[in-house]
Amino acid sequence: MNNSAFFRLQQLISPSLPIGAFTYSQGMEWAVECGWIKNADDLHCWLESLLQSSVQTLELPVLARLYHASCHQDREAFTHWAHTLLAWRETRELRMEECQRGHALTMVLDRLPDAANWPELQQPEWRDALAQTQLAGFALASARWGIELQQALNGYLWSWLENMVIVAVKLIPLGQSDGQRELYRFSDQLAAITQHALAMDDDDIGSSSPAMAIASCLHETQYCRLFRS
């Protein structure tokens, strides 16, 4: 991966990317409110469960397939996997989050000098798929900018984990150093998670995160909340 591709990846995974990632907790806010997550050890268990049962088995393998579809200009496959990812979101909040982030990333790409000329952004069928999930725009941009697939997956994985830790620092609350320790604890596992995701067959893709689904459902009616999911 050349220097330009490396820095474009940093832009895609930056917390400053204006897609509203910081406004979503994916059910963690309710999990903290009800006492499921009270400290750093509870947080570690929560994140480890999501990594093993959702991110590794759904988001990352779908991202890989969206990347390949982008490289081969396969609109049918691109649309299929974008809709598949959205269909796996169990609650209204999680589906809204997926679509809102997908729409926001598409708007960002529309305003970038080279991306504005990509044919995919000019075609309604591609744009419909891009609006289903952030992963679609992430995959398209990664393919167009020459970011290697494994590095794209590593980058997305780190971005997801970092955002979840930032949420936990605000909610539990954890100290900033505690948050960094949590990121460090996971860092040795992330490459193996990416490798596992790359080796998955289509029929094995899916998510099984009942705790997150329950937390997300109950978050929809939580009386006082900071986050949109």
From Swiss-Prot:
Gene3D superfamilies: Urease accessory protein UreF. GO terms for molecular function: nickel cation binding. It is found in: Cytoplasm. It comes from the Bacteria. Coiled coil: none annotated. Pfam families: UreF. The keyword Phosphoprotein does not apply. Keywords: Chaperone, Cytoplasm, Nickel insertion. The keyword Chaperone applies. Transmembrane segments: none annotated. GO terms for cellular component: cytoplasm. Its main location: cytoplasm. InterPro entries: UreF, UreF_sf. Belongs to the UreF family. Required for maturation of urease via the functional incorporation of the urease nickel metallocenter. UreD, UreF and UreG form a complex that acts as a GTP-hydrolysis-dependent molecular chaperone, activating the urease apoprotein by helping to assemble the nickel containing metallocenter of UreC. The UreE protein probably delivers the nickel. This is Urease accessory protein UreF. It comes from Alcanivorax borkumensis (strain ATCC 700651 / DSM 11573 / NCIMB 13689 / SK2). The lineage of its organism: Bacteria, Pseudomonadati, Pseudomonadota, Gammaproteobacteria, Oceanospirillales.
